[in-house]
């Protein structure tokens, strides 16, 4: 039995993306994020749209349909979370050599960087109050 859709979760900073990837026989690449077209949801920002579509471009896949549900964080973090989820879901459908391409280019690795917590006695995570000598 061959799968035609898969559901995967991706995370980045405080963003969580749950995507459903469909690989139909025909049709163009369509990405819906929270019910809107990706271009509109990402506020017409081509850079973040390119981040979301980069796994498909790397593997030269033109027939796909993605439904993404994202919450938390900003647009950049959400785009990276969607990219990770798409890459994870593609790794189920593709051959080992293509999976290796994704791994080498860092698409299957979660970026664990997040905001550092604020410490007491400081204004921010590392910003100290101004030192007064006298």
From Swiss-Prot:
Keyword Transcription regulation set for record: no
Gene3D superfamilies: 3.30.230.10
An individual GO BP term: translation
Subcellular location: Plastid, Chloroplast
Span of the signal peptide: none
UniProt-listed InterPro entries: Ribosomal_Su5_D2-typ_SF, Ribosomal_uS9, Ribosomal_uS9_bac/plastid, Ribosomal_uS9_CS, Ribsml_uS5_D2-typ_fold_subgr
Keyword annotations from UniProtKB, A to Z: Chloroplast, Plastid, Ribonucleoprotein, Ribosomal protein
GO molecular function annotations of the record: RNA binding; structural constituent of ribosome
GO CC aspect terms: chloroplast; small ribosomal subunit
Listed HAMAP family: Ribosomal_uS9_B
Family (UniProt): Belongs to the universal ribosomal protein uS9 family.
Protein name per Swiss-Prot or TrEMBL: Small ribosomal subunit protein uS9c
